[in-house]
């Protein structure tokens, strides 16, 4: 089973924030694949489907971002999912809004949700789809910036990036990730 995890924060006040862009992708995939996300015992919203003949799972952790590993790791253990079949989708300050970047592995890049997953999994060897949110340009603290909403000017590029990330996830169901990286990395 392939597991797609979109990182974000639970609650209405965070719904459309930059930090929740991973949730946007999971919502898009749930719509495409007709997956109903339900609360699971793993402190997250979870659903499964068969896509292109392959079993897939979608997850939106309901822990706060900094505790994402507390949802993801028990889920991986319970369903006996190989770490190689896990793709984590999240926001990236170092990419401009609208850009996506796929990686086979790596450090956290300062992202607390990814830090939590690395800590709980005990490895950096999992696939990622990073979606650019840019950096604050007006001196706004990063912690406030990631919890802010996209500007009207940014929204078209961001929504296009969400669709491209969802397309990459779809391709990753049946295609080696290295090929997906070649097709989607700019």
Swiss-Prot record:
PROSITE patterns on file: PEPT_TRNA_HYDROL_1, PEPT_TRNA_HYDROL_2
Catalytically driven reaction(s): an N-acyl-L-alpha-aminoacyl-tRNA + H2O = an N-acyl-L-amino acid + a tRNA + H(+)
Top EC class, one word: hydrolase
Superkingdom per UniProt: Bacteria
Record-annotated site: Discriminates between blocked and unblocked aminoacyl-tRNA: 9
CDD domains the record matches: PTH
A Pfam match: Pept_tRNA_hydro
BP GO annotations: protein quality control for misfolded or incompletely synthesized proteins; rescue of stalled ribosome
Cited InterPro entries: Pept_tRNA_hydro (IPR001328), Pept_tRNA_hydro_CS (IPR018171), Pept_tRNA_hydro_sf (IPR036416)
Annotated site residue numbers, Stabilizes the basic form of H active site to accept a proton: 91
Molecular function as annotated in GO: peptidyl-tRNA hydrolase activity; tRNA binding
Keyword Acetylation found: no
Annotated GO CC locations: cytoplasm
Compartment(s) of residence: Cytoplasm
Keywords: Cytoplasm, Hydrolase, RNA-binding, tRNA-binding
Subunit-structure text: Monomer.
Entry similarity comment: Belongs to the PTH family.
Name the record gives this protein: Peptidyl-tRNA hydrolase
Species per Swiss-Prot/TrEMBL record: Geobacillus thermodenitrificans (strain NG80-2)
């Amino acid at each position: 089973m392939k597991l797609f995890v979109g990182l974000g924060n639970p609650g209405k006040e965070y719904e459309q924030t930059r930090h929740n862009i991973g949730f946007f992708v999971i919502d898009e995939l749930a719509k495409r694949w007709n997956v109903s996300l339900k609360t699971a015992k793993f402190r997250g919203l979870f659903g499964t489907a068969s896509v292109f003949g392959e079993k897939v799972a979608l997850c939106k952790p309901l822990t706060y971002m900094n505790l994402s590993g507390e949802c993801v790791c028990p889920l991986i253990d319970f369903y006996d999912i190989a770490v190689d079949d896990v793709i984590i989708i999240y926001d990236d300050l170092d990419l401009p809004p609208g850009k996506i970047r796929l990686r086979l592995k790596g450090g956290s890049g300062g992202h607390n949700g990814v830090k939590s997953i690395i800590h709980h999994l005990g490895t950096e060897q999992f696939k990622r789809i990073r979606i650019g949110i840019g950096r604050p340009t007006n001196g706004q603290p990063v912690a406030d910036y990631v919890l802010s909403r996209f500007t009207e000017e940014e929204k078209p590029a961001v929504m296009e990036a969400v669709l491209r990330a969802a397309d990459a996830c779809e391709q990753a169901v049946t295609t080696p990730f290295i090929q997906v990286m070649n097709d989607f990395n700019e």
